[in-house]
Amino acid sequence: MNNDVFPNKFKAALAAKQVQIGCWSALSNPISTEVLGLAGFDWLVLDGEHAPNDISTFIPQLMALKGSASAPVVRVPTNEPVIIKRLLDIGFYNFLIPFVETKEEAELAVASTRYPPEGIRGVSVSHRANMFGTVADYFAQSNKNITILVQIESQQGVDNVDAIAATEGVDGIFVGPSDLAAALGHLGNASHPDVQKAIQHIFNRASAHGKPSGILAPVEADARRYLEWGATFVAVGSDLGVFRSATQKLADTFKK
């Protein structure tokens, strides 16, 4: 059987510096994720760090996105090889790795997604990603079709951005604005000039190494500014945020 994710179109689009507009998925529900997958976003983050997701909730969401053109990206809870291996085996190919601060941590993320000798991924001959052993060329194709996006969200990460961006196998640099703001002494204020300066610096250094940059920006003016600064994969909202604001607006309309 053929695996319809080879070649990885999202990885290719990032490499070609094509703008990719995405959305965050935090509701952890296959129906809401299926609806989100119909909206036309280029990519969707299924969040395993701050949302109540695990293997048992990710699988039905991946099933719900089977017919969607939106590329699923999983944000792992932590940069840990066993966790990443399990997410690979259930069918994720695009990974967002939080809180990467050094080149060594970036290298670990890459190695965790690659079979030997390029990496340390454990081998199972039958799992959901290889359609339970029916994809004949899975081992040959897997390593080169994995996307690794590393998240910079600390002062140490900013200091090491050049080394991180230069890491072989890293496909893009993603800014975590909220944690970055907190790390720079401006908790809850990602709009502070110091934070904005750091964000632009990260974008510039990523570009200098030929790597695309991205960010979460649910405020339209912020998203458009980041695109002007050179970011190419931008998440412009979240299912949770849209649901909350829309229901609040609806209630307010009739309860005034």
From Swiss-Prot:
Protein's name in the database: 5-keto-4-deoxy-D-glucarate aldolase
Cofactor binding comment, as recorded: Binds 1 Mg(2+) ion per subunit. Can also use, although less efficiently, Co(2+), Fe(2+) and Mn(2+).
Keywords: Cobalt, Iron, Lyase, Magnesium, Manganese, Metal-binding
pH dependence of activity: Optimum pH is 7.4-8.6. Stable from pH 6 to 7.5.
Family note: Belongs to the HpcH/HpaI aldolase family. KDGluc aldolase subfamily.
Cofactor requirements of the protein: Mg(2+); Co(2+); Fe(2+); Mn(2+)
Gene Ontology biological process terms in this record: D-glucarate catabolic process; galactarate catabolic process; glucarate catabolic process
Regulation of activity: Inhibited by acetate, chloride and bromide ions, nitrate, fluoride, cyanide, EDTA and pyrophosphate.
Keyword Chaperone applies: no
NCBIfam families: GarL, PRK10558.1
Broad class of enzyme this protein falls into: lyase
SUPFAM superfamilies: Phosphoenolpyruvate/pyruvate domain (SSF51621)
Chain residues that bind Mg(2+): E153, D179
Organism this protein belongs to: Escherichia coli (strain K12)
Annotated EC: 4.1.2.20
Site entry: Increases basicity of active site His: D89
Chain positions recorded as substrate binding sites: Q151, S178, D179
GO MF term (any one): 2-dehydro-3-deoxyglucarate aldolase activity
Induction: Induced by D-galactarate, D-glucarate and D-glycerate.
InterPro entries to which the protein is assigned, alphabetical: Aldolase/citrate-lyase_domain, GarL, HpcH-HpaI_aldolase, Pyrv/PenolPyrv_kinase-like_dom, Pyrv_kinase-like_dom_sf
Record text on subunit structure and interactions: Homohexamer; trimer of dimers.
Other comments on record: The catalytic mechanism was originally thought to use a phosphate as the catalytic acid, but this was subsequently disputed.
Stated role: Catalyzes the reversible retro-aldol cleavage of both 5-keto-4-deoxy-D-glucarate and 2-keto-3-deoxy-D-glucarate to pyruvate and tartronic semialdehyde. In vitro, can catalyze the aldolisation reaction between hydroxypyruvate (HPA) or pyruvate (PA) and D-glyceraldehyde (D-GA). The condensation of hydroxypyruvate and D-glyceraldehyde produces 2-dehydro-D-gluconate as the major product. The condensation of pyruvate and D-glyceraldehyde produces 2-dehydro-3-deoxy-L-galactonate as the major product and 2-dehydro-3-deoxy-D-gluconate.
Catalytic machinery residues: H50
Catalytic activity, reaction form: 5-dehydro-4-deoxy-D-glucarate = 2-hydroxy-3-oxopropanoate + pyruvate; 2-dehydro-3-deoxy-D-glucarate = 2-hydroxy-3-oxopropanoate + pyruvate; D-glyceraldehyde + 3-hydroxypyruvate = 2-dehydro-D-gluconate; D-glyceraldehyde + pyruvate = 2-dehydro-3-deoxy-L-galactonate
